[in-house]
């Protein structure tokens, strides 16, 4: 059975009582629960611990696998927010990927519109230069409501640019909220570029994009079939847990998700034919 590198997104570490959990506490929890890696958001106030991030592998045995950011593809080349993304990317530990949602400040541009593909390509090129120097990747992150909203949008850009450092993220929640059907086709089409996956429990009629974000052992979305499809298509990369807005007892929620994930892995190892359910 293939063993994925497992991480938790930093969205898992926030609730209404504590706010955002301290970096060192996050690391301690992840190690105790059997995670392999940590994941951060790429923003100035979220990188005040950048020096500690560089020491994370030695201190905790955790990889800093990726950082999340948004990039406005309509903004001018010298846009300060876009420039900040590039600057912060360069401060990350070597090998730490940038997972990037492509947005637009022009509300007249519809999600997935191919009319601004050329602008997206233009904005991505300098970040790919940084990725090469950092020995890392830029991974396109489909996100509900963003210009890059669908898996197929990321595939289109990867195919057009043909850059070895440009990859794709499959976000279970955002796929469920935006598309929610033809999962096998989405995965198989993405596989040539797929470098990262994040998953969570989810049900319809929630407050976020019409769906909920929950620990992995709850909700209506069939994450076992998703994991089976990934294995059938040969995906061996990292898999993480999304936790935006869950709140509550962070440790318990992560423990539930990890237990559910390991249970699904075990089922697939015992019944490999079950990977063909969809």
Question: Residue locations for each model-derived region?
Answer:
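Histidine-acidic metal/acid-base catalytic patches
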Residues: 1-11, 15-31, 121-125, 129, ...
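Active-site mouth loops of central-metabolism enzymes
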Residues: 7-22, 70-80, 109-117, 215
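Active-site-proximal loop/turn and secondary-structure-junction residues that shape catalytic pockets
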Residues: 13, 44-46, 70-73, 102-108, ...
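Catalytic domains of carbohydrate-active enzymes, especially glycoside hydrolases
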Residues: 22-46, 94-96
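Non-catalytic positions within long, well-ordered alpha-helices that form the structural scaffold/packing
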Residues: 31, 58, 90-93, 132, ...
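Conserved beta-strand positions in the central sheet of alpha/beta enzyme cores
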Residues: 39, 66, 97-99, 139, ...
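Glycine-rich, proline-tolerant flexible connector loops at the mouths of alpha/beta enzymes
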Residues: 39-59
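Active-site acidic/histidine proton-transfer and metal-coordination neighborhood
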Residues: 78-168, 177, 252
């Amino acid at each position: 059975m293939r063993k994925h590198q497992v991480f938790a997104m930093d969205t898992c570490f926030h609730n209404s009582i504590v706010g955002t959990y301290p970096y060192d506490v996050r690391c301690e929890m992840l190690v105790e629960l059997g995670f392999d890696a940590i994941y951060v958001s790429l923003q100035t106030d979220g990188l005040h611990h950048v020096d500690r991030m560089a020491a994370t592998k030695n201190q905790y045995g955790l990889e800093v696998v990726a950082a999340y950011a948004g990039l406005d593809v309509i903004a001018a080349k010298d846009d300060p927010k876009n420039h900040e993304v590039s600057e912060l990317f360069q401060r990350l530990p070597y090998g730490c990927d940038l997972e990037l949602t492509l947005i637009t400040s022009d509300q007249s541009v519809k999600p997935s519109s191919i009319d601004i593909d050329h602008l997206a390509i233009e904005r991505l090129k300098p970040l790919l230069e940084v990725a090469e120097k950092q020995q890392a990747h830029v991974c396109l992150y489909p996100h509900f409501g963003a210009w890059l909203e669908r898996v197929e949008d990321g595939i289109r850009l990867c195919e057009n640019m043909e850059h070895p450092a440009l990859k794709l993220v499959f976000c279970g929640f955002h796929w469920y909220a935006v598309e929610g059907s033809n999962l096998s086709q989405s995965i198989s089409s993405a596989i040539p570029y797929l470098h990262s996956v994040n998953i969570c429990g989810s049900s319809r009629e929630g407050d976020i994009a019409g769906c909920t974000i929950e620990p992995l052992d709850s909700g209506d979305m069939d994450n076992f079939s998703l994991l089976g499809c990934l294995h059938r298509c040969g995906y061996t990369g990292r898999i993480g847990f999304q936790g935006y807005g869950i709140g509550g007892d962070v440790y318990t929620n992560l423990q539930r998700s990890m237990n559910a994930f390991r249970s699904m892995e075990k089922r697939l190892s015992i019944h490999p034919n079950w990977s063909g359910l969809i």
